[in-house]
């Protein structure tokens, strides 16, 4: 049997304007083919959304389509996004922190209207040819606590603009696993069977068997203490089909189908860390912003900027007490005149989900914990 773990920090009642925001991150996730995956759909979508605000022409049209937004909905969607972020509250047992930084080279002329509207969200001026990596890492670490978010492979002397967002989540299970009951047990995947530390808890949880095109999957919700955040776990024989079926609306629908049951739940402890170049994924959704001849960010500057790099670093640790997960998404731009450089038991899926807004902060797949 193949298992899917969805660690989802999402809001179950997404407004129609933000469903496309969530779906953009899900589509990006579906284009990742690794065995073990941890990814932040929220981090990806947030970077794309913040690049939409200064975009114009075909670049704006493509990004609006990516977010499934009409032009007149952009302002209200931004307001709803900021409102949704306010609902990701930190409590005694759960800590959620999100940051956004836009670093623009001193040589780029920013329009006063753009600066006035967005500087309060974290707009910085610097010289990318003078120790930019250390300066940016210092600012990001001061704001987020995350260190060494960027390196010299991400930024170079051609860089003129970098958009960086971070997300950090730490949650304690509402129903913790008893550490004294963790035992070595078998986990079977396509490569064979291995021994892993398997956690165990007997408690009442919300779960159900859901059916997708005659395929059945067992889904269970593991809530975090004192927060509207849950981990959803799903397991079945065809997890590729399950992943292909995921949308923001379907996650809402499936979550409403879950009922209270007493489970003897066994889940392996696991840690995953991924560092990936996601430019090719974003390029499929909004190709013009990566094209030196077609990109346009004229709502921010008349300089001929285009995106030439995009990365996401993410990691997650799941144990008997709860979950710690973090991700940073980095989008890097240069000017057209610069030479372009190209930087080339069973498996399960996880989604970390805020149960009020629909934002998917993390999702992934574990083939070998």
UniProtKB/Swiss-Prot annotation:
CDD domains reported for this sequence: serpinO_SPI-3_virus
Compartments in which it is found: Virion membrane; Host cell membrane
Function: Negatively regulates superinfection and syncytium formation in infected host cells. Acts in concert with OPG185/A56 protein at the host cell membrane by interacting with and inhibiting the mature virion entry/fusion complex (EFC). This mechanism ensures that new virions released from the cell cannot enter already infected cells.
UniProt superkingdom: Viruses
Pfam families registered for this protein in UniProt: Serpin
Complex formation: Interacts with OPG185/A56 protein.
Coiled-coil stretches: none
Main location: virion
Induction: Expressed in the intermediate phase of the viral replicative cycle.
Signal sequence bounds: 1-15
Topology of the protein relative to the lipid bilayer: Peripheral membrane protein
One cellular component term from this protein's GO annotations in UniProt: host cell plasma membrane
Lineage: Viruses, Varidnaviria, Bamfordvirae, Nucleocytoviricota, Pokkesviricetes
Protein family membership: Belongs to the serpin family. Orthopoxvirus OPG040 subfamily.
Alphabetically ordered keywords of this record: Host cell membrane, Host membrane, Membrane, Protease inhibitor, Serine protease inhibitor, Signal, Virion
Name used for this protein in its record: Superinfection exclusion protein
Gene Ontology MF term list: serine-type endopeptidase inhibitor activity
